[in-house]
């Protein structure tokens, strides 16, 4: 059985497709969704959304939001998404190291918060590269 998934930002539809399985970046960990899942609304962390169809995973980097799950339909509402570019494994690893150092060297709460968001994005980028390679 397949389910429908839509990923939306305030200004556009990122994707509208079918999926065999969806894995969402929830605030308390990953949320796996299969067809027939119980109704649920959950907050999403900045991280990697994975959509599986015909044994192929498609990653999308989300920048926070929420998801509504209802049996055979998943609607993901996010603030923004980060486009996946042709980034290699070594570049993604370097970005993760740079983001980790920025968190460690942050001097103010705002710097730490901004660096933490960038660290989450860098982690999601590295995960996405691993799924695409």
UniProtKB/Swiss-Prot annotation:
Record carries keyword Repeat: no
UniProt GO MF annotations: ATP binding; proton-transporting ATP synthase activity, rotational mechanism
Keywords attached to this entry: ATP synthesis, CF(1), Chloroplast, Hydrogen ion transport, Ion transport, Membrane, Plastid, Thylakoid, Transport
Location(s), subcellular: Plastid, Chloroplast thylakoid membrane
Pfam family, one: ATP-synt_DE
CDD domains: F1-ATPase_delta
Gene Ontology CC, one term: proton-transporting ATP synthase complex
Membrane topology, as annotated: Peripheral membrane protein
InterPro entries: ATP_synth_F1_dsu/esu, ATP_synth_F1_dsu/esu_N, ATP_synth_F1_esu_C, ATPsynth_dsu/esu_N
Family, per entry: Belongs to the ATPase epsilon chain family.
HAMAP family listed in its UniProt record: ATP_synth_epsil_bac
PANTHER family per record: ATP SYNTHASE DELTA/EPSILON CHAIN (PTHR13822), ATP SYNTHASE EPSILON CHAIN, CHLOROPLASTIC (PTHR13822:SF10)
Role played: Produces ATP from ADP in the presence of a proton gradient across the membrane.
Subunit-structure text: F-type ATPases have 2 components, CF(1) - the catalytic core - and CF(0) - the membrane proton channel. CF(1) has five subunits: alpha(3), beta(3), gamma(1), delta(1), epsilon(1). CF(0) has three main subunits: a, b and c.
The protein's name: ATP synthase epsilon chain, chloroplastic
Gene source species: Phaeodactylum tricornutum (strain CCAP 1055/1)
Gene that this polypeptide is encoded by: atpE
């Amino acid at each position: 059985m397949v389910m429908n998934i839509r990923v939306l930002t305030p200004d556009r539809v990122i994707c509208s497709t079918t999926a065999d399985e969806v894995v969402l970046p929830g605030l308390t960990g990953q949320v796996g969704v299969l067809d027939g899942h119980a109704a649920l609304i959950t907050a999403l962390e900045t991280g990697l959304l994975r959509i599986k169809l015909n044994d192929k995973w498609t990653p999308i980097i989300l920048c926070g939001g929420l998801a509504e799950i209802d049996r055979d339909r998943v609607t993901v509402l996010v603030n923004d998404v980060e486009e996946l570019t042709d980034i290699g494994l070594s570049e993604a690893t370097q970005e993760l190291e740079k983001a980790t150092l920025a968190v460690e060297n942050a001097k103010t709460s705002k710097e730490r918060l901004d660096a933490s968001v960038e660290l989450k994005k860098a982690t999601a980028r590295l995960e996405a590269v691993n799924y695409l390679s």
